[in-house]
Amino acid sequence: MRTILITGASGGLAQEMVKLLPEDRLILLGRNQEKLEQLYASHPQAECIGIDITDSSAVQDLVEELYQRYGQIDILVNNAGYGIFEEFDQITNEQIHAMFEVNTFALMQLTRLMGAHMKEAGKGHIVNIVSM
């Protein structure tokens, strides 16, 4: 059985991924834990965690806690992200920075933290799904 962590798990793409992973232990991250628990109540081995992945210290603490609990995580799927669908000249700098916090910086931090554990273990896979 593989242990797979998926970010952005309340979105449609993650919901489709989970359907393809019925035998795996899943760690599903999203902003709204209650929504995650409703979506994945029928998956026998899903742990739903509400977290803001732009909160660097919370992410760092979570990664350490998960590795203590599970020993290893086989696959990281960086699925969290969003786009801004407005006229380009109407997008504010604040919106751009917020989007990059989720789509780029949070992805890089989680990849760096979990990648270090995977490198130490000599195995692991990271899948990045990006939005812009």
Predicted segments with their positions:
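A short, exposed helix-loop element centered on a Lys and neighboring polar residues
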Residues: T111-R112
